[in-house]
């Protein structure tokens, strides 16, 4: 019985020793979340103001360029240059297209022919959503605001941050 009591006391003291030596995990200060939330809120407000300013610039540009431009629900402008009676483009569909990208000053940035799968995010968001409005064989012009194109990062030396882009598209 004495051996059992000694063993029990030894086990209890060893377990107390090990449990008291563990470090508690560091905790964030209670007000840390408020600072982060405020910064995010400020960034969102700045981005909304920039987007609103860009929208007014693009509206003026679109209406001055051609009265046929329409504004989409998500914020890009488009017009169908050559309409067809083909089928509407759908998600997961393979499309071959000719694409010329231009600055708002009408300087050519890039011209290429490519094959893409709709919905695979191979193009900027605004252009991919715009293609879903077209029928096979159509040609169209899109004015994509920076926040639906390459955003605040741009694309290398060719497309600077916060740059809106015009795309002239021909679907095959």
Predicted segment positions?
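Sec-dependent N-terminal signal peptides
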Residues: 7-15
């Amino acid at each position: 019985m004495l051996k059992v009591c000694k063993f029990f006391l030894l086990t209890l003291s060893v377990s107390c020793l090990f449990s008291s030596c563990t470090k508690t995990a560091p905790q964030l200060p209670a007000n840390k979340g408020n600072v982060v939330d405020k910064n995010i809120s400020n960034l969102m407000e700045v981005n909304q103001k920039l987007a609103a300013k860009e929208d007014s610039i693009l509206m003026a540009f679109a209406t001055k360029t051609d009265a046929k431009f329409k504004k989409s629900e998500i914020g890009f402008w488009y017009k169908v240059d050559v309409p067809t009676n083909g089928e509407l483009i759908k998600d997961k569909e393979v499309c071959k297209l000719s694409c010329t990208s231009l600055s708002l000053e009408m300087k050519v940035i890039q011209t290429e022919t490519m094959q893409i799968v709709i919905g695979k995010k191979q193009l900027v968001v605004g252009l991919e959503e715009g293609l879903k409005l077209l029928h096979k064989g159509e040609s169209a012009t899109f004015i994509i605001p920076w926040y639906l194109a390459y955003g605040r990062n741009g694309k290398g030396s060719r497309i600077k941050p916060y740059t809106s882009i015009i795309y002239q598209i021909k679907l095959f």
